[in-house]
């Protein structure tokens, strides 16, 4: 109990992403620019889905939730990292570390569930178009959204409580730019082997099972697309689904490396790069992937800009 109390009273010292780089100012500038681009991109996408009635469909409702997660995930880590860099220190309180673990895990797991639901939406739209209005009615969409949040909260609560239950009575220096479960477990003076094994095992349920469901959904979609006679319908289906598959590959690839590959097989520098990838790079790319390849989003943006231009002229 004394060890636990000592842990509560102490701060963690985050080494930070920029300590491993010679050109710290340049890397900081790149991270800051990506953060702003991602924040603006996801905010604009949320706004367009909100104001354009043509985007009031199940697919865009789920996409708006993805944008919400992609706004929240970088907000948990990047402002704190930037503040530490500008102040020249990396101390974070025990409560602050717990908050980072909880909210990042919540949004990461919830986004993983959401990607499965988005693949189901595309499966129904392409393979069962006549039943789409029933299978993807508003109540079902709200249930999908709620389930992703519930699964995220439950998983985050369990992981945070177990991780912070271990005593951290040795080094308080976290070789990472935010408090994350794998990085903290390396500092514990207790035996964490069983929990690390449980993390890898749970990765099968949290990561590999959803990934297999997504692959199955898009396998059926691919079969249906190849049998389509209309070139326009085939092109639209391929464009939409390829965007989803790109997002899935970026998100799950980084998550599998971080949480299913044993810590002994990757260095802290690799952990920093991979964590930056799913906490900043992927949320920044997602709105670009969906908007650049989606004519409906472009039309909504043009419509909003046209209205703004007409108001200024009047």
UniProtKB/Swiss-Prot annotation:
Its main location: membrane. The chain crosses the membrane at residues 26-49, 58-79, 101-120, 140-158, 196-219, 237-259, 273-292. InterPro entries: GPCR_Rhodpsn (IPR000276), GPCR_Rhodpsn_7TM (IPR017452), Olfact_rcpt (IPR000725). Residues 1-25, 80-100, 159-195, 260-272 are extracellular. It is a multi-pass membrane protein. One of its GO terms (cellular component) is plasma membrane. PROSITE patterns: G_PROTEIN_RECEP_F1_1, G_PROTEIN_RECEP_F1_2. Keywords: Cell membrane, G-protein coupled receptor, Glycoprotein, Membrane, Olfaction, Receptor, Sensory transduction, Transducer, Transmembrane, Transmembrane helix. Residues 50-57, 121-139, 220-236, 293-314 are cytoplasmic. GO terms for biological process: detection of chemical stimulus involved in sensory perception of smell. GO terms for molecular function: G protein-coupled receptor activity; olfactory receptor activity. The keyword Flavoprotein does not apply. It is found in: Cell membrane. Glycans are attached at residue 5. Belongs to the G-protein coupled receptor 1 family. Odorant receptor. This is Olfactory receptor 2Z1.
